[in-house]
């Protein structure tokens, strides 16, 4: 089985967040201009549910698809009722950006992470947080039910499959897991393989773990980003994922992308296929042959790599596993006749037999 591009939908601005909806073919997308969209991929149309005052970094569906929650660089959570299409609540939850927003698998919780990289000493290590870096909210009551500390900036967050544990990771490669029921730190771990110290041009730290997710059984964590660089502005660190076994006395790395399978570039999103046998990683490519790839979950080997010449920010499989949804952006280019191009993208891949290819005429919408 292979994956082929089925459809490419142009959006007005870069798409930063993505969520599927239960019992619906529609998708939720959050955008660079602050807008929250409900997209109908069949018709390539959308409606605007709400608007943030800065980049809308994430959007999720909760409460069995009856509500959408969005977060942005304005540090605000917005709650959108999908039946009426109206924004029903707005709350300032962070003094800085919401880097990432995730919903628990049971649809009852949402978690947002924040944190600003400020110099904390002579070695330019990050300063300690000024506010709790992780906040968890009840989807029904919209009230905060937990908050946890971490070293900022905290870039990524994930719930375990049973919705009991919460993991978060930062720029320095620190991963922490909390037990939400007991409100305690379960484990912590560090990997140096995602963080750069600038030797050329800029002397500071950069990079980090841009996404993480639990395995379907919950025993492992996958984390992704890119490898260290001498020039932090180059964006050419090695495409990287690692697998962590976190439940033991001492968390340990038990898997990693093979050198022969990877190129260079920032990897920003991970998604597990519903059958648990495959996972996807995507981002942007600086050098190599792919920016979207499917990996065998057991062996960790590359199954298929694809280059769609897009910076991918979020990914999600359809519930039945026959489609892979990707959001991101193309190069914006120069304005033509006073108008900027539609540089946001929603890409839909579908599974096809290995000897069958999607007709080129059906692969994109005006690309």
Segments predicted by a language model, with ranges:
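WD40-repeat beta-propeller superdomains and closely related acidic/aromatic-rich repeat-like regions
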Residues: 1-367
């Amino acid at each position: 089985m292979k994956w082929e591009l089925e459809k490419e939908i142009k959006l007005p601005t870069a798409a930063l967040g993505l969520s599927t909806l239960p019992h619906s073919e529609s998708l939720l997308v959050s955008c660079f201009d602050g807008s929250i969209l409900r997209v109908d991929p069949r018709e390539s149309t959308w409606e605007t549910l709400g608007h943030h005052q800065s980049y809308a970094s994430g959007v999720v569906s909760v409460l069995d698809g009856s509500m959408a929650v969005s977060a942005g660089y304005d540090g605000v959570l917005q709650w959108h009722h999908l039946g009426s299409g109206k924004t029903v609540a707005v709350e300032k939850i962070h003094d800085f950006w919401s880097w990432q927003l995730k919903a628990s698998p049971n649809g009852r919780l949402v978690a947002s992470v924040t944190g600003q990289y400020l110099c904390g000493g002579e070695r330019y290590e990050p300063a300690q947080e000024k506010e709790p870096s992780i906040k968890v909210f009840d989807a029904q009551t919209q009230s905060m039910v937990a908050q946890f500390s971490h070293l900022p900036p905290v870039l990524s967050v994930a719930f375990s499959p049973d919705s009991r544990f919460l993991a978060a990771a930062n720029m320095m490669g620190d991963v922490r897991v909390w037990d939400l029921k007991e409100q305690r730190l379960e484990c912590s771990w560090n990997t140096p393989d995602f963080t750069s110290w600038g030797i050329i041009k800029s002397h500071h730290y950069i990079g980090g773990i841009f996404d993480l997710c639990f395995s379907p059984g919950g025993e492992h964590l996958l984390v992704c980003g890119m490898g260290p660089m001498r020039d932090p502005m180059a964006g050419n660190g090695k495409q990287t994922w690692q697998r962590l076994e976190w439940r033991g006395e001492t968390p340990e790395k038990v898997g990693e992308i093979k050198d022969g399978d990877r190129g260079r570039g920032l990897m920003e999103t991970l998604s597990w296929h519903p059958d648990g046998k495959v996972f996807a990683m995507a981002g942007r490519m600086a050098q190599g042959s792919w920016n979207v790839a499917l990996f065998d979950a057991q062996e960790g080997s590359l199954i298929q790599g694809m280059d769609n010449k897009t910076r991918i920010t979020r990914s999600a499989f359809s519930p039945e596993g026959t489609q892979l949804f990707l959001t991101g952006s193309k190069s914006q280019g120069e304005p033509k006749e006073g108008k900027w191009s539609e540089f946001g993208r929603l890409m839909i891949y579908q599974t096809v037999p290995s000897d069958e290819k999607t007709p080129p005429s059906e692969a994109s919408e005006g690309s």
